[in-house]
């Protein structure tokens, strides 16, 4: 939310509007109860070195800020129709995703993203990764532009009649692929693992890593040990020092309801330095009780 707030400030240059556009209330609602003010600063080193800061008691400091591609944890899911916009940007809940797919369908993507897809274009690669998430499913986007709606078919079934995993993963995959085409953008994804079975979560982790290797800038918020372990495996098996591109943070509240942030480093062998207590350890805890 902090990054999205800075993005809105850069867009609207109005503190109050920047807050309300995100539906998070005013600054009094998002400020920690133990803080006197809100202060946020972002420095983007690899995207034309831009910087923006916000202080609730001072003027806003604005410099160029990257385009944000944001996919919320609350996505449209298995709905019969998806809204269309007049632009080619994907909405936070996956709105306009089929219009975006049509617009970029013939764009050539990096060779590393192709995998087992039939071709290197956006549409082929997208279909290929959807099949990795849910094997042998045929995806068909349908647009009714005069009615400003769209819908998708999976094996000739409407999305409301198939599992949530496909419709929930679709905007995530599209956002990641867009990040490789627009490398001045920042891709923010909440819970890419939502409604996906463990094998599919692993495949999603591989796509995230491949897109970062292809030039995308990605921030992921996840509760999935399958996703995290998949990234660790990619670090171990990749020969291009991918681990050096990964930063992991573990956030939890302390006794004063303040957010405590611990960082850990994934080494090139996939092992983790400074593993924070409580981070993705429930499987081991449960396994010990079952043995």
Residue ranges, per PLM feature:
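Walker B catalytic acidic pair
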Residues: 190-191
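C-terminal lobe/lid and adjacent interdomain/linker elements of RecA-like ASCE P-loop ATPase modules
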Residues: 202-291
